[in-house]
UniProtKB/Swiss-Prot annotation:
Organism of provenance: Caulobacter sp. (strain K31)
Swiss-Prot/TrEMBL keywords: Ribonucleoprotein, Ribosomal protein
UniProt-recorded name of the protein: Small ribosomal subunit protein uS2
Family that this chain belongs to: Belongs to the universal ribosomal protein uS2 family.
CDD domains: RPS2
Keyword Cell cycle: no
GO cellular component annotations of the record: cytosolic small ribosomal subunit
Single annotated GO MF: structural constituent of ribosome
Length: 313
């Protein structure tokens, strides 16, 4: 993925350039105001575009480093877009009511989150033996905690950056973030105070289409950062595996059969067996007897030798 892209036309079509009535403005927003039409301030989108891009880059960096991003928007128009965008990018949100001390008193809030998990366990299958009245009370308590803490119950600590819609309504959340040095990305309408906002984005904070566009861009930046973080920390498992040691390779190699290991010896044994078989199968050859003439000559010589012995004596 790449950093989400947007254009001036998208912002104009979403109505991001419309501010509040001229008599409801905050003079500190004067540098972001282009002019007024029909007593309505017009926001200078030529400044909003680079500021929005800068905010998206920061959100992407935080997500790539494994940081937590908290979406905050408790006004009616922002509630659903904030929750939907946060869930889509696996981040956290507060869209019902900001509880004082959510960030600065996180230990106490963690206790409330533990109670919420306990109630979820009770209602999920441990409700046996409880009366209907008791179950009704537990359900109401769970629903109340879910509205305020359901979006941050898995956060596990304070966020690394916070995205806020309507700084006037979320003034307490911004104050807590400033105390903890948490960067704040905020949509600033013409009636807002830009002081203390780390990454201001001048724009309409009431139009539904504009709010949806802001939330989608922030969520896309988070997703891009998560993808970049995985790519940077990913390990090529195939390249990391060391080659097999020679001794281990020999142990793992199956031994060949005798005929394959010693073909010459096997061939000699087979030849000997075949020769023995042929010899056993062949008929026995008759004994060789001396010729009659040779036998007679040998007998005559023996008689003459015996006859000459007395004469010599």
């Amino acid at each position: 993925m790449a950093l989400p892209e947007f254009s001036m036309r998208q912002l104009l079509e979403a109505g991001a350039h419309f501010g509040h009535q001229t008599h409801r403005w905050n003079p500190k927003m004067d540098r972001y105001i282009f002019g007024s039409r029909s007593n309505i301030h017009i926001i200078d989108l030529s400044q909003s575009i680079p500021l929005l891009h800068q905010a998206l880059v920061k959100v992407r960096e935080v997500a790539a480093a494994g940081g937590r991003v908290l979406f905050v928007g408790t006004k009616r128009q922002a509630s659903d877009p904030v929750a939907t965008a946060a869930k889509r990018c696996a981040q956290y949100y507060v869209n019902h009511r900001w509880l004082g001390g959510t960030l600065t008193n996180w230990r106490t809030v963690s206790g409330s989150i533990a109670r919420l998990r306990e109630l979820e366990g009770i209602m999920g299958g441990e409700s046996a033996g409880r009366s209907k009245k008791e179950l009704l009370q537990l359900t109401r308590e769970r629903d109340k905690l879910e509205l305020s803490l359901g979006g941050i119950k898995d956060m596990g600590g304070i966020p690394d950056i916070m995205f806020v819609i309507d700084t006037n309504k979320e003034a307490i959340a911004i104050l807590e973030a400033r105390k903890l040095n948490i960067p704040v990305v905020a949509i600033l309408d013409t009636n807002c105070d830009p002081d203390g906002i780390t990454y201001p984005i001048p724009g309409n904070d009431d139009a539904a289409r504009a709010l949806q566009l802001y939330c989608d861009l922030i969520a896309d930046a988070v997703l891009d950062g998560l993808a970049a973080g995985q790519a940077n920390s990913g390990v090529d498992l195939g390249a990391s595996i060391a080659p097999i040691e020679p001794t281990l390779a020999r142990e793992l190699t199956p031994e060949p059969v005798a005929e394959a290991a010693a073909p010459e010896v096997a061939a000699a044994e087979v030849a000997e067996q075949e020769a023995a078989f042929e010899a056993a199968a062949a008929p026995a050859a008759p004994a060789v007897e001396p010729a009659p003439e040779a036998a007679q000559e040998a007998t005559a010589e023996a008689i003459e030798a015996v006859a000459e012995e007395p004469a010599a004596s």
